[in-house]
Design a protein with these regions (language model features):
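Post-Walker A helix-loop "phosphate-sensing" segment adjacent to the P-loop in P-loop NTPases
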Residues: 44-55
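Sensor-1/coupling segment of RecA-like P-loop NTPase cores
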Residues: 100-129
Length: 158
């Protein structure tokens, strides 16, 4: 799978919209910024379909990768975007890194820790911050922001 993929995940209260550009994207952030909420919304949409009240818009399938069958799921899935929460211990294994490297899928990893076994770009590390105010009748728009910009990557040699 190649190219950019726009992902929109929304219900009547929350709206996430972002673009996946590479095979590995990292989402980081402090507690209560909406990382796990994004995963939960995707899980509900995957498990309950339209009855979940959650709309997922993307040109490729967006799925959750978790549990003990993760390797079996990866072996039988192509051209999808997998979202993985930090609670999954397999993310830190050499076996997972090897599967990601050989996969035709994209991966969005939600974690606060460094993943030394995975070759991801510093330009594909994002955070989430709310762009709207929380009110009972108002939708909250979650925005992604790039943690490291191209200008921060410049190193001066003396």
């Amino acid at each position: 799978m190649r190219g950019k993929h726009r992902v929109i995940v929304q219900n009547n209260r929350l709206h996430y919209e972002f673009e996946i550009k590479r095979n590995i994207t990292i989402i980081r952030g402090d507690s209560a910024t909406g990382k796990t909420t994004l995963i939960n919304m995707l899980r509900q949409a995957e498990n309950l379909g339209n009855s979940s009240g959650i709309e997922v818009s993307c040109d490729v399938p967006c799925r959750i990768l978790e549990g003990s069958n993760w390797k079996l799921i990866l072996e039988h899935t192509e051209n999808s975007i997998f979202f993985i929460d930090e609670e999954n211990v397999f993310v830190h294994t050499v076996e997972f890194a090897s599967c990601v490297k050989d996969s035709g899928n994209y991966f969005v990893l939600i974690t606060r820790e460094n993943l030394y076994g995975l070759p991801y770009s510093v330009e594909e590390i994002y955070g989430i911050h709310p762009a709207g105010k929380y009110q009972n009748t108002r939708k909250i728009y979650q925005q992604m922001y790039q943690i490291f910009s191209k200008f921060q990557n410049l190193v001066t040699m003396t």
